[in-house]
Amino acid sequence: MAGNLFVVAAPSGAGKTTLVRMLLEQESSVNLSISYTTRHPRPGEQNGREYHFVETPEFRAMIARQEFLEWAEVHGNFYGTSKKWIADQLAAGRDVLLEIDWQGAQQVRALFPQAIGVFILPPSMEELTRRLTGRGTDSPDVIDRRLAAAQAEMRHVGEFDYVIINDQLAQALDDLRAVVRASGLSFGAQRARHAALFERMI
């Protein structure tokens, strides 16, 4: 695998989507994998940009055709990652970032043990509650379910290589960029990127 595969997970409301968007604006070498989902688009979202929005029967057909690297049901909706797209990007030496949940991260790392796991934590449950409430898109019942799910998800933080606490957005972004840049300087990444140099020098 020539490119690095980053798996970024977080409970809903931890700021993962914002952090990933800002990272992609500053690190042009990282390519975002756009997941398929049966969730309805939120205001401002576009098909093919935030997600590939599909109906549940189509998603189930894609599962049957084994087109997903990973897939999971989260909050009553399905999410999945295209297996072929990921493999093609990595083979071409491109870094890929997956923005998925912990269940998907487990599936990905079973197939790609060298994938780099990053978990985003909120600074407190109180702040997480404030962020979810402030969205104004979910009912109180949905928010309660998301908070309960968040607590369950955060129990899996030990399965990841890096943990970033998103208290101050700028600092969290610096931390995420540091993970990406350091991973690009690992022996395996440098050897794949500069194979001819390593053959001559070592």
Swiss-Prot record:
Q: Which Pfam families match?
A: Guanylate_kin (PF00625)
Gene Ontology cellular-component terms listed: cytosol
Q: Which residues bind ATP?
A: 10-17
Please list the reactions this protein catalyses.
GMP + ATP = GDP + ADP
* Entry keyword annotation includes Cytoplasm: yes
The record's subcellular location field reads: Cytoplasm
Q: What residues does the Guanylate kinase-like domain cover?
A: 3-181
Q: Which cysteines are joined by disulfide bonds?
A: none
Listed A to Z, the keywords are: ATP-binding, Cytoplasm, Kinase, Nucleotide-binding, Transferase
| Keyword field contains Kinase | yes
The record's GO molecular-function terms, alphabetically, read: ATP binding; guanylate kinase activity
Q: Which InterPro entries does the UniProt record give?
A: GK/Ca_channel_bsu (IPR008145), Guanylate_kin-like_dom (IPR008144), Guanylate_kinase (IPR017665), Guanylate_kinase_CS (IPR020590), P-loop_NTPase (IPR027417)
Stored SMART domains: GuKc
What family, per the record?
Belongs to the guanylate kinase family.
Record's NCBIfam families? guanyl_kin
Q: What does this protein do?
A: Essential for recycling GMP and indirectly, cGMP.
Q: What is this protein called?
A: Guanylate kinase
Species in which this protein is naturally found: Dechloromonas aromatica (strain RCB)
What gene is this protein a product of? gmk
